[in-house]
Amino acid sequence: MGAHHTATEQSARLFADACAVIPGGVNSPVRAFNAVGGTPRFITSANGYWLTDADDNRYVDLVCSWGPMILGHAHPAVVEAVQRVAADGLSFGAPTPSETELASEIISRVAPVERLRMVNSGTEATMSAIRLARGFTGRPKIVKFSGCYHGHSDALLADAGSGVATLGLPSSPGVTGAATADTIVLPYNDVDAVDEIFEQVGDQIAAVITEASPGNMGAVPPEPGFNAALRRITEEHGALLILDEVMTGFRVSRSGWYGLDPVDGDLFTFGKVMSGGLPAAAFGGRAEVMERLAPLGPVYQAGTLSGNPVAMAAGLATLRTADDAVYAALDKNADRLAGLLTDALTDAGVTHRVQRGGNMLSVFFTAEPVGDFATARASETWRFPPFFHALLDAGVYPPPSAFEAWFVSAALDDEAFDRIAAALPGAARAAAEASRPA
């Protein structure tokens, strides 16, 4: 392996093999590099902040499996917990003590959550929370915000962020008008728009769902008081407030975004960090609402693998290992990365903004503050692919989309930042020299 990480023969071969059996060669669209071009790197191992690909290239990881790996990869406490539990069986289809332990740990951190139900993915968590909100209120309509991504269930794909934004789709083929007929999409950070829609049809609205601090149109935090305004408006009209913390939960603080902006949602959704990188998620909230779920109430929700003991073990080990020092390191590392990005892009004369949602961050190639999906899409996203590839070729792995957040781990050290600092000037020049598409 030379100074540059441009050898991709094995990744290219593996990608061709994958394309023969998997649509697009990937199991989640952003991994295909369609937004940036080039060959997706096939990762064979990870440890700490290092990723190693099939061509033996090593990268400083600034994706962290899209958020979960706050401790770094293969942390000994998490690996030991998973190995110990796996030796006793992988799945039972019956209650286990670890489900209660992890639920109790989460409830102890987020005060409005009195009851919690385990599921298998963030999509399942938000889908179930929406069903529960409708069942609890007896109302059909849901309010969401343009650019906020809540998984790929049909009703919530309307004007979503994440991969839908990356592909430039307004929604997705296959999502019928009937599926989104009761989904109202409003501009993010616009309290007046929320007030207006509630004045018009408030008695039909079951819930407002929002990312507690969005990271799926890039890092676009709520304006001060925005989430509190949603709380006020929903309470006035008898609707529920669902705060989606799948991305922010237990990453931006010990208590997630709630720890930074303590707004009492009626329901919360969690994922990513809470399962330490294994497939698990959860939704929870007020006991009065949660007790409408089967088997106590009439709102049905179920899952064969929900509460999987191996995922519960990974989640417990992650949360219990992530002490105050870990969260201090996450914030410090995000500060350091943001500073390096700002310095390099400024030195290269590139108009940009580095935006933060706690220790999540994004680079927008624009001079304007990015407060919603419209301003995110108006940025010079065509500068991002050469910026991305220059970093990748220098051994730094950022997210392969201009509309995704960057994530740090507590494992990053001076060696990691030395590599990032060495890579950024060339990447900034590549962004500066990029040509606007015809």
Curated annotation (Swiss-Prot):
UniProt cofactor(s): pyridoxal 5'-phosphate
Alphabetic keyword roster: Cytoplasm, Isomerase, Porphyrin biosynthesis, Pyridoxal phosphate
Entry coiled-coil feature ranges: none
Enzyme Commission identifier(s): 5.4.3.8
Keyword Iron in annotation: no
N6-(pyridoxal phosphate)lysine modifications at: 272
Record flagged with keyword Metal-binding: no
Pathway per the UniProt entry: Porphyrin-containing compound metabolism; protoporphyrin-IX biosynthesis; 5-aminolevulinate from L-glutamyl-tRNA(Glu): step 2/2
Enzyme class, UniProt record, top EC level: isomerase
GO cellular component: cytoplasm
Alphabetical list of SUPFAM superfamilies matching this protein: PLP-dependent transferases (SSF53383)
Catalytic activity: (S)-4-amino-5-oxopentanoate = 5-aminolevulinate
First-listed, main subcellular location of the protein, grouped into a coarse class: cytoplasm
Subcellular location: Cytoplasm
GO MF term list: glutamate-1-semialdehyde 2,1-aminomutase activity; pyridoxal phosphate binding; transaminase activity
Any one Gene Ontology BP term: protoporphyrinogen IX biosynthetic process
Assembly notes: Homodimer.
Homology family: Belongs to the class-III pyridoxal-phosphate-dependent aminotransferase family. HemL subfamily.
HAMAP family referenced in this protein's UniProt entry, alphabetically: HemL_aminotrans_3
Entry-linked NCBIfam families: hemL (TIGR00713), PRK00062.1 (NF000818)
The protein, known as: Glutamate-1-semialdehyde 2,1-aminomutase
